[in-house]
């Protein structure tokens, strides 16, 4: 895929920055990369403490650089420059390149389950998921008997407004012959309109990808390992979350635990089996030692299900997904997005040093007591810190280090206030960095 002119210009900037970093530090960017990767690796393996606690950070791009969040959907080069500026200024041990995607493509497809900045939302907002009942309670058998047919004729027409005509197709599994019989339907105005919208989305996505390139690799070339190796392979998270958030919706999946438990479990099993069957092993030739496979998790929270329900519907699928990810050569990186509490004990059933438990609302001290010496903690500073002062963030983080930092096996994601100067951000990160030395 040929690179755009803007992408080529960005590449030249990266080369100049690389040379500047090497002059400033007296080290190659490859050496700096490995120093940070070693620090992260030591924390993950839980064998010995690293030289200091590894740090990541996620300041608001608009607050720090003046580039709105909408750039991640409509101005990829500006977004990449913003993420690069944040990385070079704050020097995290794991860099975040963001999750940019084409807003033009999303709009053309009329996506129903997402709202994004610069599109349905103001430019400075964060992307939002919109849950819906994309699969009805009486459609489990349709999904289980022929998932491909269900996706094409039921799921896509509901999830993407542009693809609504697909609901008029006959069952795809029956079209062994006689495809020509449905060509009049495909030639109708509504199908032609759909094809044009898909083509528009395809062109926009291709252009966006050419421009955005491999942002994580470009930051790695400047000496910064990726937080998570997106697109590298792995299995994904808990299959229950797939059913709950992308098929039945929260309400539907909660009802199904009582009214259709066996169908719900069958769907979870099928989703996981298909994911495992198509999973790609870690590529030893690519960066990442170890490679980290992210897994966002949410419905296993104590407020969504009881311990008994967790043991029946959630943990078996999640455990299999994490073990399969580990078997493929990755470190499983589950993001426990809510209050999982003592349910983290189940991570002790997995191999030592092969999981990073990302927590935010869980008591970090209790989590460290449960997992110390076995599973690395990735502790995210609370979202409320966006409105804290620099002093409050610094005090909270240093107190966390005092209580949980001993013996290694911990990394910190320092969420920074939305208001402040660049000098203030850098001073705060430097202070936390030095305080976290062993």
Model-derived regions, located:
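Catalytic cores of TIM-barrel enzymes
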Residues: 1-438
